[in-house]
């Protein structure tokens, strides 16, 4: 997959994208990420990329010309190198659709993505109307710009691309992939400061271990994210276990 990030602050990405899983995916040429500085495409003398909003109001708004010129340069590169002619253009915005695991799975099937990071009070609406295919939000809170949301999206999507993780099971058992929160994890030592690993995990009985993990996931989800259970298909054993949990309240 190829991901192009349109941003005013490309240096923000070097740390998060230059380590761990994302770094290895790029070294193995499974993933190619390039941050493109929008300011480089400003046609005015001082490389100015923002201006006061029409109608008044606080803050500054990113002007359309540098963003659209940056986008057109990226699209031309895709076309010249026989990549995707029209990749999705995702604007990271608090007004966008809430990002979740299902969306990450869909995006991981794309060959290329262009991510647009806003700043200041946002970007000129005409840019959104002209080039943006999707607006995505990572949550109901305010951030300084779209760079951190872009990193979140890249990390969530990249780990779903075949070959990025060493084992598919690594993400299939994680929180949200199955629809439930992940069960607690334990490693050595068996006892730490008086706290022991649950006996079932050292029993060698794999069916009991699976049952324990399933029940732990159900209980955690019930207490912390009950909204996830509304659309989750429960087995009869799941339903019985949850009834027992409810009776303890």
Curated annotation (Swiss-Prot):
Keyword S-adenosyl-L-methionine (UniProt): yes
Could you say which residues bind S-adenosyl-L-methionine here?
118, 138-143
Keywords in alphabetical order: Cytoplasm, Methyltransferase, S-adenosyl-L-methionine, Transferase, tRNA processing
Per the UniProt entry, the Enzyme Commission number(s) are 2.1.1.228
- Provide the GO biological process annotations: tRNA N1-guanine methylation
The domain of life for this entry's organism is Bacteria
Q: Which SUPFAM superfamilies match?
A: alpha/beta knot
Spans through the membrane = none
**Where does this one sit in the cell?**
Cytoplasm
Quaternary structure, from the entry: Homodimer.
Q: What does this protein do?
A: Specifically methylates guanosine-37 in various tRNAs.
Q: What is this protein called?
A: tRNA (guanine-N(1)-)-methyltransferase
């Amino acid at each position: 997959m190829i991901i192009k990030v349109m941003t005013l602050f490309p240096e923000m990405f070097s740390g998060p994208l230059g380590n761990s899983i994302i770094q290895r995916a790029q070294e193995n040429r499974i993933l190619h990420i390039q941050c493109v500085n929008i300011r480089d495409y400003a046609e005015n003398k001082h490389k100015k990329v923002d201006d006061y909003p029409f109608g008044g109001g606080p803050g500054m708004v990113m002007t359309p010309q540098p963003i659209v010129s940056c986008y057109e340069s990226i699209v031309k590169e895709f076309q010249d190198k026989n990549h995707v002619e029209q990749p999705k253009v995702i604007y990271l915005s608090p007004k966008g659709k809430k990002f979740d695991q299902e969306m990450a799975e869909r995006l991981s099937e794309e060959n290329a993505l262009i991510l647009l990071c806003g700043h200041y009070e946002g970007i000129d609406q005409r840019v959104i109307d002209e080039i943006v295919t999707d607006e995505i939000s990572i949550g109901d809170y305010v951030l300084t710009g779209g760079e951190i949301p872009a990193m979140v999206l890249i990390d969530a999507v990249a780990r779903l691309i075949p070959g990025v993780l060493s084992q598919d099971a690594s993400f299939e058992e994680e929180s949200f992939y199955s629809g439930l929160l992940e069960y607690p994890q334990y490693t050595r030592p068996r006892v730490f400061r008086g706290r022991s690993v649950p006996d079932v995990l050292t029993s060698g009985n794999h069916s009991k271990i699976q049952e324990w993990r399933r029940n732990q996931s159900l209980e955690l989800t019930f207490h912390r994210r009950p909204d996830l259970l509304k659309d989750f298909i429960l087995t009869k054993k799941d339903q019985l276990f949850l009834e027992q949990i409810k009776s303890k309240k």
